[in-house]
Design a protein with these regions (language model features):
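Ferredoxin-reductase
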Residues: 40-147, 202-204, 215, 231-233
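Local cysteine-cluster metal-coordination motifs and their immediate loop/turn environment
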Residues: 342-364, 370, 377-393
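C-terminal accessory/binding modules appended to enzymatic or scaffolding proteins
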Residues: 308-345
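FNR/FR-type flavoprotein reductase catalytic core
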Residues: 1-15, 136-308, 312-317, 322
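Rossmann-like nucleotide/phosphate-binding core characteristic of flavoprotein oxidoreductases
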Residues: 1, 17-26, 373, 384-400
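Iron-sulfur (Fe-S) cluster-binding modules
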Residues: 1-50, 277, 282, 305
């Protein structure tokens, strides 16, 4: 007996299949031609967390010491910033300023807890450098009501549970205290679940800014403690000398911990060999922004024949030559560009973030090896970070 296959169908199925193109065309023609104005939640969240610009306003100013002020910043709704972007303890914002003809940026670490940003307040500390360019301007001009343009929060000096130990050892001085003050505040209010042991280096006790607040936080929470290390005087409840491997081991009993470092270049130079002696895995060692080198000619590999020389830099942007600007061998190309009023995207000013990434088409630059964070391909194709590149000859630079 032959096998029989029975197919149950109808002519309507075939007819409908044939009619699909005409039905589709009719639906398209009947649809409204106005664009869909969809506001997807994921895009709204991304724009809130990572805005290209935050328009802020100074809410109040607090004198911290003879040369340090705290600025409490809030969102400037009149210019489009309704809420402040959230951040992680240890991150910074980059502030853009117009000072005379120059357009400059400076990163300032947020010293408040992220919880405070939910109440629309950032707090930054600005220490005045009498020989500086930006900090005196801020001290002299920023008052309640001053409008400020800033970036979203950036930076990698924050606790990441997939990478870091819950036991954090912080090494700092008055130039890097904001990162750890933010962490201590976050530990206190429950935003950050870590243990922080902070070694605070200073010449004298009265130079350790924010000491009273740090002591308050340490007294109220056993997950945070601070050890003051004074180099130039003896004081009660303070260590004398510098931060060393022996001193760290005296106060840290944990077998596994992360070391976070943030502060001045001299601090980095002193503690780096001490950290090496701790024999920690590299992932447990984190450095904050190193900042610009104030005396690059003092570096051992800086070309001595270039000291004191001035060169010309031809600047090109979007195919247009903006002109030739003078640049000293002992200042970064970014500083030279800003001084001439040429706006360049920059955030960290430490050779890390890559926002100022530019192409060097001719000439030579000096880049300190310890802070050269460029990709290998960038190094091969003449890509440099002007914020940490020093001219060694006349050159041509294409900026973004």
């Amino acid at each position: 007996m032959k096998n029989k296959v029975v197919v149950n169908s109808s002519f309507k199925d075939i007819k409908n299949f044939i009619n699909i193109p005409s039905l589709r065309k009719g639906v398209i023609e009947e649809a409204p031609n106005s664009p869909i104005n969809a506001n997807y939640a994921v895009n709204s969240t991304a724009n809130f967390l990572h805005p290209s610009i935050q328009y802020l306003i100074v809410k109040s100013v607090v004198d911290i010491s003879r040369d340090t002020k705290a600025y409490i910043l809030g969102p400037d709704a009149s210019l489009g910033t309704a809420k402040l972007a959230y951040f992680r303890p240890g991150q910074f914002i980059s502030v853009t300023l117009e000072i005379g003809h120059a357009v400059v940026t400076r990163p300032y670490t947020l010293c408040s807890s992220p919880l405070r940003s939910l109440d629309d307040e950032y707090v930054i500390l600005v220490k005045k450098d009498s020989n500086g360019f930006v900090s005196p301007f801020i001290h002299n001009t920023w008052v309640k009501g001053t409008k400020v343009k800033a970036s979203a929060p950036f930076g990698n000096l924050f606790y990441q549970p997939l990478r870091d130990s819950k036991n954090i050892v912080g090494l700092t001085d008055e130039y890097g205290i904001s990162s750890f003050l933010s962490m201590a505040e976050a530990i206190s209010d429950g935003t950050l679940d870590t243990d922080l042991t902070l070694f605070y280096s200073a010449r004298k006790k009265n130079e350790a800014i924010m000491m009273d607040r740090l002591n308050e936080l340490a007294s109220a929470n056993n997950k945070f403690r601070v050890i003051y290390v004074l180099s130039d005087e003896r004081a009660d409840k303070c260590e004398r000398g510098f931060i060393t491997k022996t001193l760290i081991e005296k106060y840290v009993s944990a077998t596994r911990y992360s070391v976070f470092v943030n502060g001045s270049t001299p601090l980095y130079n002193r503690v780096t060999p001490q950290i090496a002696e701790l024999k920690l895995e590299q992932k447990y060692i984190r450095y904050g922004l190193s900042g610009q080198i104030k005396n690059p000619a003092s570096l051992p590999d800086f070309p001595k024949d270039a000291v004191g020389k001035t060169f010309l830099c031809k600047v090109i942007k979007d195919g247009e030559t903006l002109g030739k600007i003078p640049c000293s061998s002992e200042e970064t190309l970014l500083v030279a560009l800003e001084r001439e009023g040429i706006a360049v995207q920059s955030v960290c000013r430490s050779g890390e973030c890559g926002f100022c990434r530019s192409k060097l088409t001719s000439g030579n630059v000096f880049i300190p090896k310890d802070v050269d964070s460029r990709r290998l391909a960038d190094s091969s194709f003449g890509i440099i970070h002007p914020c940490y590149s020093y001219p060694m000859s006349n050159l041509t630079l294409i900026i973004n």
